[in-house]
Amino acid sequence: MSTPANYTRVPLCEPEELPDDIQKENEYGTLDSPGHLYQVKSRHGKPLPEPVVDTPPYYISLLTYLNYLILIILGHVHDFLGMTFQKNKHLDLLEHDGLAPWFSNFESFYVRRIKMRIDDCFSRPTTGVPGRFIRCIDRISHNINEYFTYSGAVYPCMNLSSYNYLGFAQSKGQCTDAALESVDKYSIQSGGPRAQIGTTDLHIKAEKLVARFIGKEDALVFSMGYGTNANLFNAFLDKKCLVISDELNHTSIRTGVRLSGAAVRTFKHGDMVGLEKLIREQIVLGQPKTNRPWKKILICAEGLFSMEGTLCNLPKLVELKKKYKCYLFIDEAHSIGAMGPTGRGVCEIFGVDPKDVDILMGTFTKSFGAAGGYIAADQWIIDRLRLDLTTVSYSESMPAPVLAQTISSLQTISGEICPGQGTERLQRIAFNSRYLRLALQRLGFIVYGVADSPVIPLLLYCPSKMPAFSRMMLQRRIAVVVVAYPATPLIESRVRFCMSASLTKEDIDYLLRHVSEVGDKLNLKSNSGKSSYDGKRQRWDIEEVIRRTPEDCKDDKYFVN
């Protein structure tokens, strides 16, 4: 397929020239009232309640399936006509000159005929710091998103799309200063893998700081979060081992487990009864064919599930781990730094001793404004991983500026530098998350997740509403992320609001007014009232929501979970 003459690459944009005070405000909004803070409480000793999953009316589910059916029929008709009358435009799907097609017509159908129709809603180019506001680069397509051209326009949008939980995405401040100083001292790259010449004193300092913050004996840092999981399991699992994984675990965990060669069994998301039954069953059955006992059994779950906004039932997982002599792995990519009274993730939320979790994994991209990932565990496990992990021997180590950003953000959260700032950031994101979640529920939207989760999924269902919502919000200068199959179940398309401490209460009010307006136009307010405190009021007026919810969101009785 040839590239059209009018195709252009993403343009290079000049940095925005603004006074320092305005630039700072655009990246991290000033707290407008001490009343817009919330101190997260630990759930120590409290069981995790069963999540209340609201469902839409039957006609919405029916229309969603019908929507997909129409798209599939039209796509197959398009394919048939194209491969019959325009073969030169479909060479990658047809045999030609004795060559097999590059792609299977069936395997690529979803991407070509469904996703491409809404591709303008994904991977939108941006420039500048993704803080409170993000600068979006305007683009246009004249061929149903096959190619894009760029108008040159750049416009700021309120940022609900970035994993900037604590607002450390800033061009000025203690973290940026530390990163710039590290460039002068260490350059921008360490020059090799960790096992050779790639280890500096910054790596050692970061690992000690992470281990102390998490509450484990030692830690190991990596240059890529996805690669941390993808390469981890191969070091201590083989075909004689069993992994029992939550069905909604991240693809990086799935990739890593597959590469290890271990057997895999999945349990329904959050179903602890089903998990225990599966563990007992596998202990009895043992390995396939031989029925010998499994060499080791590893339970894998995420601390905070990024598509659902739900927490794992960590106390029950630890109980099952001890009862059946299994190992436990928890991925805290989205919970570490952003959740818990002091930002120490699900262990702190539930009052679980980190020593009861064998391996704690996390990333630096979400709460810390950096990049890379870490593994925290007992000393002997980390020592073994330093020898066996291929990423230690063959991958580039974390660059010094990224390490400096990570170290300074960790020190800010823990109060070692800039006392009080870390606490304020944690209390701001907690308030913002609870306020937006409760307000959306009161407006009538179906929202998933727990009260304090900074990930707030709002259900859209029909695939046609996904691009409509995204485009209408972009017109209102609000950047959001829409998500569909295969990242979610087929009929549960959603918009995922990523909350940040950088947003102010006025920002959320602005967001709520426009989400309510768009929700009315797209008929998205379809909850049944299950999420309301009294179970009676299913719809609130937007002005009443904005007036009453900031105080109500601080009271746990208004949240079913």
Swiss-Prot record:
The keyword Translocase does not apply. GO terms for molecular function: pyridoxal phosphate binding; serine C-palmitoyltransferase activity. GO terms for cellular component: endoplasmic reticulum; membrane; serine palmitoyltransferase complex. Pathway: Lipid metabolism; sphingolipid metabolism. Pfam families: Aminotran_1_2 (PF00155). Keywords: Acyltransferase, Cytoplasm, Endoplasmic reticulum, Lipid metabolism, Membrane, Pyridoxal phosphate, Sphingolipid metabolism, Transferase, Transmembrane, Transmembrane helix. GO terms for biological process: ceramide biosynthetic process; intracellular sphingolipid homeostasis; sphingolipid biosynthetic process; sphingosine biosynthetic process. SUPFAM superfamilies: PLP-dependent transferases. The modification N6-(pyridoxal phosphate)lysine is found at residue 366. Its cofactor is pyridoxal 5'-phosphate. It comes from the Eukaryota. Gene3D superfamilies: Aspartate Aminotransferase, domain 1 (3.90.1150.10), Type I PLP-dependent aspartate aminotransferase-like (Major domain) (3.40.640.10). Its EC number is 2.3.1.50. It is a multi-pass membrane protein. LCB1 and LCB2 encode essential subunits of the enzyme and form a heterodimer. Component of the SPOTS complex, at least composed of LCB1/2 (LCB1 and/or LCB2), ORM1/2 (ORM1 and/or ORM2), SAC1 and TSC3. Interacts with LCB1 and TSC3. Belongs to the class-II pyridoxal-phosphate-dependent aminotransferase family. Catalytic subunit of serine palmitoyltransferase (SPT), which catalyzes the committed step in the synthesis of sphingolipids, the condensation of serine with palmitoyl CoA to form the long chain base 3-ketosphinganine. This is Serine palmitoyltransferase 2. It comes from Saccharomyces cerevisiae (strain ATCC 204508 / S288c).
